[in-house]
Amino acid sequence: DIRTPMNAIVGFSELLEKNLQNEKKAKEYLGKIQSSSNLLLRIINQVLEMARIESGTAVLQLKAEDMDALFHRVHTVFEEDIRKKNLQYYADLDIRHHYVVCDQTKLQEIMLNIISNAIKYTPEGHSIYVEIHEAASENPSKIHYIFSCEDTGIGMSEEYLPHVYEEFSREHTSTENKVPGTGLGLSIIKSMIELMGGSIQVESRQGIGTKFTIDLSFDIALKEEVYGSE
């Protein structure tokens, strides 16, 4: 959702304006603005990729990436939205292999979309728990990650769950008009995950919350492949 990094840019720009005399805070806010701006650019580029996914011409742009850095960038984008809604937000990265070969843009968009949905549909003061943990892999050159996002939001009805990945599908609830969105996100995200050879599952109960779980496998990379020789 383009609004997510835009909200972060606007929010941190306002904080920067109020703290121009504080060099440490100003530098911190500038870094967050830059990070959110880069993510916004990637999302705009992803809009073009959406057409490729639907036409069957999408390909993975693979290179070595640092999962710690990617995880941090994603969460930075949501800091302002989390603060405004006073959400209890927990993020846990529990992995042994931190460098993998992946399509950074698509993987980042998957995380952004899932977490953004949780924030949208979780009322003020409620909680969201995001985790990436490493699971056993039979192939020593590959790593298996499980990404999960669980919220205590409004949830979805049992009748709607089979349709959650359909294009333009949004459940007709009393909150629908209050929450922006096109209904395209999850359909595209599922296509991206399947392009990577992974899977996505959803569990939800109306009035209790929703949990998305994503399984993905990647080739293991070395730190030198990400940052070069230091």
Q: What residues fall within each predicted segment?
A:
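Short alpha-helical segment of the dimerization/phosphotransfer core of two-component systems
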Residues: 35-40
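Helix-loop junction within the histidine kinase core
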Residues: 51-62
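Conserved catalytic submotifs in the C-terminal HATPase_c
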Residues: 61-66, 83, 88-98, 133-135
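Short helix N-cap motif at coil->helix boundaries in the Bergerat
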Residues: 67, 155-163
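Short alpha-helical Gxxx[C/S/T] motif in the catalytic ATP-binding
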Residues: 180, 185, 189
